[in-house]
Design a protein with these regions (language model features):
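A feature for loop-to-transmembrane-helix boundaries and adjacent hydrophobic helices
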Residues: 2-42, 123-423
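Low-complexity, proline/glycine-enriched hydrophobic segments characteristic of transmembrane helices
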Residues: 20-151
């Protein structure tokens, strides 16, 4: 029996090693197979969001069988002049152009109107013709979504939609909990407003403090406003949000809400807010997934978790198969929400003020802590110690706080009758 158990552990360890250990990719290229009619041609796959790297690759790549995935930043109309010059270099290097369905674009004259239809740039030993049937096969999945839903001249970005879903569902859930607790619904809108303000400003300022402190000197107004002033005034949205900063800010705004508006113990509010934040965090990570950001480290291409993000920013390094760490966190947050919701609905823990919130803190930041082992650094690591990155070090105090809050929650028990009354 011991021999069988040992072999079982050995197999399990091998599977874990296969799935979770980081992988090295020479020259930043991954492998795929280009199927041309009945012929299989091994190709090296390259992608980048940086124009300089894209241009350089056309000149230095010597591999006769190569496929370049063009992402949206490579073919934007706004960059037509520079992009067309780069693509002309590929044409001179005997590459051929294809659309998203692998239809050959013959004798192309690149214009501002057709540049966005180009998706793949391919070079093979034998040129491909329009009569050939072409497809790409890889051992990993390729995640290359559109940025949003186009409604005439307006684009509804999926990242923004995920935030809307998060706050919309949060409003519904908070209303439902206030009804369950027999609390006047006039108190729902203020907590929604203050949480929104705290989340956006706290997440933005937290990101700059922990990951991009140089912005305070280089582009001060971009810290507080969704604009950039470095190369003229430009609307950018808030590019860079940190959950640790959002947490601190929401704690502070909720204190104000608790003492000045609803006049209840802040722990009572935190218990319910934690449930909402758990599911909201899942939506935010889905938004990161659509944006190809907060990605994981390189992974073995045969791992069931391997995913290629052609639209990833070059700040994460080479574009090769990686862990979808956004999804790992999102799944963890959904499970946390389910647990907290069941405890709130089926037990009396909601009357032990702070217990649910403490549990929320422990599990949420534990999820963040462990997923960070598989995640690429987000910019320069402002804090690092003993092999832990900034995100992990910042998570530890929150987990400790969760344990402390759970222990002291015994002192803040209330009855069902007291639950509905403002303090």
């Amino acid at each position: 029996m011991s021999t069988i158990l040992f072999r079982t552990y050995l197999v399990a360890f091998a599977l874990i090693s296969q799935c979770f250990f980081s992988q090295y990719y020479k020259d930043g290229l991954s492998d795929g197979t280009l199927k041309i009619n009945s012929q299989n041609i091994p190709v090296k796959i390259f992608a980048t969001s940086e124009p300089v790297e894209l241009d350089s690759f056309a000149q230095v790549n010597k591999n006769p069988n190569t496929l370049v995935i063009l992402n949206k930043s490579n073919v934007e109309k706004e960059r037509f002049i520079s992009s067309s010059m780069i693509l002309a270099n590929y044409k001179n290097a005997k590459y051929e152009f294809f659309d998203k369905d692998f239809k050959l674009v013959e004798n192309i004259s690149i214009t501002a109107d057709n540049i966005e239809t180009l998706k793949y740039v391919v070079r093979t030993k034998k040129p491909i013709t329009s009569a050939d049937t072409v497809s790409l096969e890889t051992p990993f999945k390729i995640w290359d979504p559109t940025s949003g839903i186009q409604l005439g001249p307006v684009t509804l970005h999926f990242y923004s939609l995920m935030f809307i879903f998060a706050f919309g569902l949060g409003y519904v859930l908070m209303t439902k909990m206030y009804k369950t607790d027999h609390v006047n619904l006039k108190y729902v809108e203020p907590i929604f407003t203050w949480t929104l303000i705290g989340t956006i400003l706290g997440a933005r300022i937290g990101h700059v403090i922990f990951y991009q402190p140089e912005l305070f000197k280089e582009d001060f107004w971009s810290v507080f406003l969704p604009i950039s002033t470095k190369n003229g005034l430009k609307f950018t949205g808030f590019a860079g949000l940190a959950s640790h900063g959002a947490t601190i800010a929401v704690i502070l705004t909720t204190l104000y809400y608790s003492f000045k508006i609803i006049k209840k113990n802040p722990l009572w509010v935190y218990d319910r807010l934690g449930i909402v934040v758990a599911i909201g965090g899942a939506f935010v990570r889905m938004g990161n997934f659509f944006n190809s950001e907060i990605i994981g480290k390189p992974v073995d291409p045969n791992s069931p978790f391997a995913l290629l993000f052609p639209q990833q920013s070059s700040e994460y390094g080479i574009t090769v198969p990686r862990y979808p760490t956004q999804l790992f966190e999102a799944v963890g947050y959904v499970l946390l929400f389910v647990l907290l919701w069941i405890l709130y609905r089926k037990t009396n823990k909601k009357y032990q003020q702070g217990w649910l919130f403490g549990l929320f803190f422990i599990i949420l930041w534990a999820i963040r802590f462990f997923v960070e082992f598989l995640k690429e650094p987000q910019g320069d690591e402002f804090i690092s110690f003993a092999g832990l990155n900034t995100g992990q070090i910042l998570s530890i105090p929150f987990m400790i706080a969760g344990f402390v809050i759970m222990i002291y929650s015994k002192k803040f028990k209330i009855t069902e009758a007291e639950n509905a009354k403002p303090e």
